[in-house]
Amino acid sequence: AIAAVITFLILFTIFGNALVILAVLTSRSLRAPQNLFLVSLAAADILVATLIIPFSLANELLGYWYFRRTWCEVYLALDVLFCTSSIVHLCAISLDRYWAVSRALEYNCKRTPRRIKCIILTVWLIAAAISLPPLIYKGDQGPQPHGAPQCKLNQEAWYILSSSLGSFFVPCLIMILVYLRIYLIAKRSHRRGPRAKGGPGEGESRQACPVPGGPSASAKLPTLATPVASASEANGPSKPAGEKEEGETPEDPGTQALPPGWATLPNSGQGQKEGVSGASLEEEAEEEEEEEEEEDEPQAVPVSPASVGSPPLQQPQGSRVLATLRGQVLVGRGVGAMSGQWWRRRAQLSREKRFTFVLAVVIGVFVLCWFPFFFSYSLSAICPQQCRVPHGLF
């Protein structure tokens, strides 16, 4: 019965992890750099199921090590390597989740496939450093029954404690602290609500990863446009620059002239009036990637006394009319675009938190499964006589 259950678990492990690797490598929606962690973790689990569990099952059923001594040493090293790699992978994934939630804009620019591969390589090197001592130093392997060869790990206290700390307890402590920190961040951001720091009410604009040779992120376009002159100015002779009519109120210094090249909007009252239709520099840089944002580009339509007799200008949804000393300016949906960017950012954070919760459940179950082994394994080094664990329970 035990052999049948273990065999089913072996096949299920191989099949399930093979599907994970296949899904990440073939699905375009799963080709994010962070999913390389899942590919490496699944590979480690497949290696455990194919190279470790079958020989462990044979050793338990026979009661002795049937295979050669050389393979016993390699088997012990691979056992520590693959199991430690699986646990440290989960630790690396938890750190990746934490950086993605706490420093999303900055870390998303740095989360490249090259960086993720370097982290994965570091994980395997840590696991290899912990698994090498059984190959280099055989140490005390405990009493060997006559005529029944055994294959056991180094039974010296220093190796038991150091391997337990590096393989389980330290990564487990890191994961607990990291997920506690993620929980506190999620709780604080939920309390702050939509008007919290970074919300649309404070004019936050979404930052993009810096592009070499691109426009400066600090460049800003004017919010208000200088409205056109009255009908008498439009139909009468133009005056030299800087010359004002008698009794005319000086121009509000808060209003800025439109940059050259902005498109004009037609008006039914007179041929065409000057108007503006443009996008911020950041939106222009993102135009190719997010074409749907084009409808959120800010527009400013001047409204002057000359247009009183004309049909009323329809105000676009989400726009607003600002009054100046020389008339009114209809400002388009710049704030709406900003708000849309903020809500997209909120949706991204929500997805990160949901994924983090799922990973926390998986890691919690994984830790609960490993804790009994490492706890009893460590007791054999701390108090080998007084805290002896029954062989069947171990």
From Swiss-Prot:
Q: Which domain of life is it from?
A: Eukaryota
Q: Tell me where it mainly resides.
A: membrane
What CDD domains does the annotation carry? 7tmA_alpha2B_AR (cd15321)
Q: Alphabetically, which GO biological process terms does the record hold?
A: platelet activation; regulation of smooth muscle contraction; regulation of vasoconstriction
What keywords is this UniProt entry annotated with? Cell membrane, Disulfide bond, G-protein coupled receptor, Membrane, Receptor, Transducer, Transmembrane, Transmembrane helix
List the biased-composition ranges (Acidic residues).
281-298
Q: Which GO terms describe its cellular component?
A: cell surface; plasma membrane
PROSITE patterns in alphabetical order: G_PROTEIN_RECEP_F1_1 (PS00237), G_PROTEIN_RECEP_F1_2 (PS50262)
Which cysteines in this chain are paired by disulphide bridges?
A: C72-C151
Record localization: Cell membrane
Membrane disposition:
Multi-pass membrane protein
**Which stretches are tagged as biased composition: Low complexity?**
299-312
| Membrane-crossing segments per the record | 1-25, 37-62, 73-95, 118-140, 157-180, 359-382, 392-394
> What residue ranges lie in the Extracellular compartment?
63-72, 141-156, 383-391
- Enumerate the GO terms in the molecular function aspect: alpha2-adrenergic receptor activity; epinephrine binding
Q: Which residues lie on this side of the membrane: Cytoplasmic?
A: 26-36, 96-117, 181-358
Role this protein plays:
Alpha-2 adrenergic receptors mediate the catecholamine-induced inhibition of adenylate cyclase through the action of G proteins.
Q: Which PANTHER family match?
A: ADRENERGIC RECEPTOR-RELATED G-PROTEIN COUPLED RECEPTOR, ALPHA-2B ADRENERGIC RECEPTOR
Q: Family, per the entry?
A: Belongs to the G-protein coupled receptor 1 family. Adrenergic receptor subfamily. ADRA2B sub-subfamily.
The subunit structure is: Interacts with RAB26. Interacts with PPP1R9B. Interacts with GGA1, GGA2 and GGA3.
What's the protein name? Alpha-2B adrenergic receptor
Organism of provenance: Oryctolagus cuniculus
